[in-house]
Amino acid sequence: MVGKDCVAIACDLRLGMQALTISNNFPKIFQYGDVFLGLTGLATDVATVSDLFRYKVNMYRLREERNISPQTMANLVSSSLYEKRFGPYFVSPVIAGINQTTGKPFICGFDSIGCIDFAKDFIVSGTASDQLFGTCEGLWEPDLVCPNCRIVMLGRILTRTAGPRGPLRDHFTGAAERYRPRRTIRLGSTCLHY
């Protein structure tokens, strides 16, 4: 989600299939310098693609002697996925970052063969993307400042699916699990658990 001079990216940590939960600590967002890459899809391909881009970004940093920009990372992801178009990775990447030269936020998404979907407001990906589009359209506002962008991402979206101490129910995909907040943020009278 894009705000005014800021960007926020969020995901769940659940690894599973329908009602079967394998892990509650599976990373899906990876940081490459100042750029964040979110990967949804097949777990083995998520691990493979994240390692592949870690290697390519490190090679870029050594060759160019600077960190990769979000736009360059988008082109790298697109060309790398297109190389494997006849045997694609089953992932749907999302890139979020701030261009260090212009200071402008940048987000984009991809399909499994590298077609770039640029956006100026928000990008969603994964099994619940159809439902998340409606939720994000209702909650996104132009020119959100940085703390408000995080509040929208964490507070509004997550509190609509979780009670304060009850079970966390993923209304979009139908998986239920016990809700245990990992961190609590107090903002005035509002308390956010995530």
Where are these regions (language model features)?
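Long, low-complexity N-terminal extensions
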Residues: 1-194
